[in-house]
Amino acid sequence: MIEVTKLNDKKVLINSDLIESVEETPDTVISFTTGKKIIVKESRQDIKNLVISYKKEIFVGI
């Protein structure tokens, strides 16, 4: 799970395994394999870095 910030400043945890795509339009829109979408304050690169960090934690066993 990664934490992101919605446009209303609410923080939410999302399942990074369900992310299908991330695009900037100019807001960052995360699309999920479930068909849902969420608009967040983080940039596309920030989301990428969060997912990479999360995956490293899981696979290293921290």
Predicted features, each with a name:
Residues M1-L13, D17-I62:
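Eukaryotic intrinsically disordered, low-complexity regulatory linkers and tails enriched in Ser/Thr/Pro
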